[in-house]
């Protein structure tokens, strides 16, 4: 029976987390601190950088084309960064923060000099969080926020554009664009004729991607989502590395052990923590010689 309040909601980030480490997925997406009844979130410098840049660039899609650059983008970035400065962004020293902030400023300057699709018509899906029923029978919903939809008036079609702030390129097996393609096809009426990444850290132009087959993508994603639902029903989310953990779940285990510092709550009331890696090394991580 389908019920969006009891359904399993899956997204690109939650599916990726599950595939990397079921334990990490559980701690990041399902677990709630019994003391606060809030989910937990770990803030880090790369996450802060991505959040600040995305906030600036994505906000432009809500503004009319001829007014998008009326306010200097670097001023917008400065406002976004202030919310993430210091420990709020996972920065424990000024030098590290300066490096990340400078990278963010360079990305914004790149957008100013080479606005590309940001200077053209865009489509905004009228949903705070685009979603659709991946399977009503299995009570599974697919959701996700799309960075940018470029509109082509001649063909009345759209191009999905995803902004990347990481220095690493997405692999060919990434499910991100296939998921976004499904969402856009189900949440608005225009055909998707192109998909691209924009690597803001290194490129002035879009990097086109192959348009995935909708049916094949949906079948693949539903298969993974069913595994996620089964493991949730069993309450079984084990790390592939066993009790020693992995890079995906260890940082969240540190929160549970009281080794992380609480810095506040995000817009969704999650408890946000930061981890100073240099001060949280356990004795087993070092040897006295």
Language-model segment annotations:
Residues 1-289:
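RecB-family 4Fe-4S metal-dependent nuclease core
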């Amino acid at each position: 029976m389908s019920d969006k309040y009891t359904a399993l909601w899956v997204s690109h980030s939650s599916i990726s987390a599950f595939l990397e480490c079921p334990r990490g997925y559980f701690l990041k997406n399902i677990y709630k601190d019994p003391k606060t009844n809030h989910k937990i979130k770990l803030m880090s410098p790369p996450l802060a950088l991505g959040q600040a840049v995305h906030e600036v660039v994505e906000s432009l899609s809500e503004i009319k084309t001829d007014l998008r650059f009326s306010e200097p983008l670097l001023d917008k970035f400065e406002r976004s960064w202030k919310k993430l400065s210091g420990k709020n962004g996972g920065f424990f020293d000024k030098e590290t923060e300066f490096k990340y902030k400078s990278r963010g400023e360079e990305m914004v300057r790149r957008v100013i000099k080479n606005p590309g699709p940001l200077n053209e018509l865009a489509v905004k899906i009228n949903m705070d969080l685009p979603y659709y029923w991946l399977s009503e029978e299995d009570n599974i919903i697919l959701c996700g926020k799309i960075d940018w939809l470029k509109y082509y008036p001649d063909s009345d079609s759209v191009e999905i554009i995803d902004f990347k702030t990481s220095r690493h390129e997405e692999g060919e097996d990434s499910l991100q664009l296939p998921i976004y393609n499904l969402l856009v096809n189900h949440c608005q009426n225009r055909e998707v004729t192109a998909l691209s990444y924009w690597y803001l850290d290194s490129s002035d132009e879009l990097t086109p991607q192959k348009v995935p087959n909708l049916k094949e993508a949906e079948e693949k994603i539903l298969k993974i989502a069913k595994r996620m639902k089964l493991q949730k029903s069993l309450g079984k989310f084990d790390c592939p590395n066993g009790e020693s953990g992995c890079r995906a779940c260890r940082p969240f285990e540190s929160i549970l052990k009281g080794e992380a510092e609480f810095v506040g709550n995000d817009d969704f009331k999650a408890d946000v923590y930061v981890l100073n890696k240099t001060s949280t090394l356990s004795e087993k991580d070092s040897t006295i010689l």
